[in-house]
Amino acid sequence: MPDWKLQSSNEVMLLEAYGDSPAFDALLKATGRGARRDSPVDQDCIDAKNSVDNNDLEILHAPPGYAFFPSFFSLSRQFPTDGLTFISPCYMGLHNNVSTPEMKLRAHDWPPQTPDFVTHDVLATYIQDTAAAYDVLSNISFRTRVDKAEKKGSKWEVQSSRLVDGEIETAVQQFDALIVASGHYHAPNIPDYPNLPAWKSAFPSRITHSKVYRSPTPFAGKNVLVIGAGVSSTDICRELGSVAAKIWQSSRGGEYDLLPSMLPENCTRVGGIASFSTLTSTSLLHNTAPIPGSVILSSGEELKNIHHVILATGYHMSYPFLPHLHDDNATPEHANEEILVTTGQITHNLHKDIFYIPDPSLAFIGVPYHVATFSLFEFQAMCVAAILSGSSSLPGQQEMRKEYVERIAKKGVGRAFHSLKDDEGEIAYVREMVGIVNQGKKEGEKVEGHSKEWFEAYGRRLVRMKEKRGRKVEVEVKEKVAGPAEAVQNEGVK
């Protein structure tokens, strides 16, 4: 097994943030690195614009959250042609639903009296204050996009472009290792329903993905079809309930669908979608006019007088800066031993959902889901640091491959592959991370895993998840604490 110890030169850390905390903003100004305009829920901006020029340099190099308008969307599985039309899946009413005690970083405490469930700006402030406290800012390149990354010889060659005073500056840099921490929620899943592309083409602002949803205000008095019945869909339906005239929520009866009892009174749970009808007109619609077509359900029922369709159909894996490791023509079952992405359901060929088996100098943070994100990703980062610094080591490639193949045989190559939702799944995974970090460490130097406070909060999470999905509660905890109603969204996903 090669030694993947990093040299001191060219070490880099990139962070992605969603709005500046006071401490972070102060550092930006003090270092002259410029302010960022990336609030994902700037309502004034939402109300002022209905379309954006995708070729505008400010948009092409904007952080996630700045560019989020429905006109950006293409109804294909591919990224937009500019490659950088990033849209942040964050809306005004978003709360965490995995509690703050579970997400607490070992490196930084939450402010005193922080509730278990908070708004997204509190979460952003916590991450940014952590970065400010540890001088992460000096290692961040803002308004920069990675265009391509490729291993050449013993180094990773990274091509990037940066917007400076309205002009694009390009750069090519070499690194000993590449760590990808770009997350799950950027490449929307678009279902292949007959005539859906025609509806989107004719009325682009009426057919959107949940990723661009920001607030219920634009849907006041309208009839809305929300496709999908998972956590994001249910959260959106609950918000729409106070303003929309009529809501339908389409469900295929999936494993992660929430209970219909959680929906507002003006929302009806219906079955899966069979097709979208042929449009009777493609003329410009008045704001109050419904779409001139209908949606046919699998049962044969027909939904009419629909003003808006929201596709709450999730996301798929995509790493557009690693095109040589994508094979969009292959099925997951036929992925070879080098490819990372096929249909986007999973990221292939990773050891422990982190290390690229053919070349562990490529590592990923944040691939597992149904977890307490911040804390689990911190354990992953500690594991990566231990391997790349040489203080710990990985098994040989043959052993890593054997473990990966056995895992596929057990879990399959569907979306459940990266899920740690099963009882003890997340706990066992963190134990593995800690085991790797502690290789060769003496007593007194070893890193500990989850804290007592984490386990108590985790027990409460299991209760909430099983109650919301109508399952028998098998886990007993002394204290049962439920989050606010808003905390239902994305339960166990983020």
Where are these regions (language model features)?
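C-terminal, flexible cofactor-proximal segment of oxidoreductases
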Residues: 349, 361-494
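Acidic, polar low-complexity intrinsically disordered regions
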Residues: 4, 24-27, 41-56, 66, ...
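Conserved SAM/SAH-binding loop
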Residues: 143-147, 161-163, 211-214, 272-274, ...
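Glycine-rich dinucleotide-binding loop and its adjacent helix/turn
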Residues: 111, 119-123, 132, 136-139, ...
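Rossmann-like dinucleotide/flavin-binding elements
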Residues: 211-249, 319, 343-389
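A Rossmann-like FAD-binding core segment of flavoenzymes
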Residues: 238-334, 387-421, 426
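Core beta-strand elements of the Rossmann-like FAD/NAD(P) dinucleotide-binding domain
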Residues: 164-177, 218, 297-308
